[in-house]
Amino acid sequence: MNRITYFKHSFFLICIILGCSSFAQNYIPFTPRFDQDVRGDIILIGNNILGPNNEAFNENSVYNHNVDMRYVDIDNDISTYSSSSADLEIPNPNCYQIIYAGLYWGAVTGGSESITEVQLKGPTGVYNDVTGTVIYNADDNITGNSFPYSCYADVTDIISNLENDLGTYTVANVSSAQGETSSFDPYNGTGYSAGWSLFIVYEDPTMPGKSITSFDGFSAISSSVNLDVPVSGFRTVPEPAPVRANFAFAALEGDKPIRNDLMLINDVNLSTIDRPANNFFNSSVTRLDATVVTNRNPNSTNTLGFDTGVMVVPNPNN
C-alpha cells in the first residue's frame, strides 16, 4: 500500500458492487477509477428499482425471493420501463463544485433489455441517455440461481451541464429479471434485486484537503465461506499522523432478515446503528452519520436485496 501524501487528512473510498453466487470468488479485481487530492468531500446516493409496486416497501421480515418482483417506475414517463430517484444534498450549498460523478447500476440477474443502456435525469432538464461500461456480466459464465451484472458510466459532463445540480436525480431503465423466484420450478431461493448508486466528488475550499480514491470491481460472496477482497493503490498520511477513512459501497442480494453477513476491513468488523455487525448487508440505503436515507422515491425501509451507503472505518490503533 502506497504511503505518499500531500494533505493533512486522508480519505479512502471504495465503491463496490457485490453479487451473490453458490460459491465465493473475486471475478474482477478492484482497481482505481478516480484518484485525486481534493479540498472537499464525497456523497453517495442511490435506490433500488425492484419491488411489488411503486410504493415504499416496509415489511422488514420479508425475503426478496418471496416477493413477486416488478419494475419500480415512478417517473410517469411512458418511455421508461423502470425508474427510481434519490435527492442530492451538499452541506454547504453556497460554496461547492462537483468535479466527478460516477454512476453504477446492476442486478442479480439481467432482464431482456440492454444492461448497458440507462437514462439519468437531474433536478432540471430531461433524461440523458447513458451508455455504461460493463464491470462484470455473468451471463452464462457461472451456474446457479443468479447471473449478476454491474455497469459503470462517468456522468460528470451531464451533471456539470445542469442548470441546478442539487435536488432529485432519477435513474431509469436499469434492466433486471422479474418474478417471485421461490415459486420457480426448480425452486430458486436467491431472489431478484437491482438498483443504482451515484458517487459524487465535490470541491469546497473551506474544507480540509483529502486524498479521494474510488475503486470498482466485482466479487461474488456466499454463505458458505469467507472471501478476502484485496484492494491496494490508495494513499494515506505518513506516520504518526492519524489515518481517517470512510468506506462507500453498493451490494446486491443482502436480504434484511438474513443474519451473519459481515464486512471486515483489516480484520475490523464494520457496523453502525443501522448496519449491525451480524447483518451488514440488510437491504438499506444509509449515509455517513449512520442513519437511513429517506429523501428518495420509493423510500423503502426494505430495499429487497439492494444496499448502498457510506460509513466511517474504525481505526482505533492509529
Regions found by a protein language model. Name each.
Residues 28-43, 48, 194-318:
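Helix-biased "structured C-terminal domain" signature
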Residues 55-100, 171:
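A short beta-strand-loop element at or near the start of a globular domain
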Residues 110-130, 263-268:
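Solvent-exposed beta-hairpin/edge-strand motifs
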Residues 87-89, 97-104, 119, 152-154, ...:
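Residues within well-ordered beta-strands of beta-sheet-rich folds
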Residues 62-83, 142-149, 217-225, 252-254:
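Extracellular beta-rich ligand/substrate-recognition surface
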Residues 93-100, 105-113, 125-127:
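Primarily extracytoplasmic ectodomains and periplasmic/lumenal surface modules that are beta-strand-rich
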Residues 1-27:
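Bacterial Sec-dependent N-terminal signal peptides
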Residues 123-189, 276-318:
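Cysteine-clustered segments with highest specificity for TGF-beta superfamily mature ligands
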